[in-house]
């Protein structure tokens, strides 16, 4: 039996905690680990980053994302063909110029551009659809640096244990406006009233295995 509900896992994360759910194990488990426990090998990881008018943020954050990816490779946590997928959501500034220039000079950076601004969730979805056949797992994360990128280590550990969905969950909404907090609470109440299983305060910061994306 696999857990039906999400569970909280620990970690010293200042801005994000994480929850994970385990689906039916449709994904291939590549190796048998210690004492017969099935473990996945290191995945080809795609880090999907939606961007909209981020010409000031990208020069600051891209080196951090690349350094994180390099460290994960160096520590043998992810495969050498792992990469960043940057999604330009119809930016009106030089965001796409920055992405395309970096992609030309760094094989670990790839990018796609939406014809117009379609919204954050559509940008994330476009990135996931682009990478789903090119990776074993993806992690989607915002470009603004508010999420703790070191939480990726724990997400990858859970993936290697066989979990297909790992949620980032906000430990606090204090940075949100009163209106955003109020509408979020109303949204979660509505979902609960409709009988949906709700992961409260979950963020777009999450890991998905390739079978889930497909």
Regions found by a protein language model. Give the residues of each.
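Aromatic (phenylalanine/tyrosine) cluster motif
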Residues: 2, 7-9, 13, 20
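N-proximal low-complexity "stem/linker" segments adjacent to membrane-targeting elements
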Residues: 33-67, 71, 76-78
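Short beta-strand/loop segment that forms part of the nucleotide-sugar
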Residues: 73-90, 113
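A conserved acidic beta->alpha catalytic loop
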Residues: 85-96, 145-146
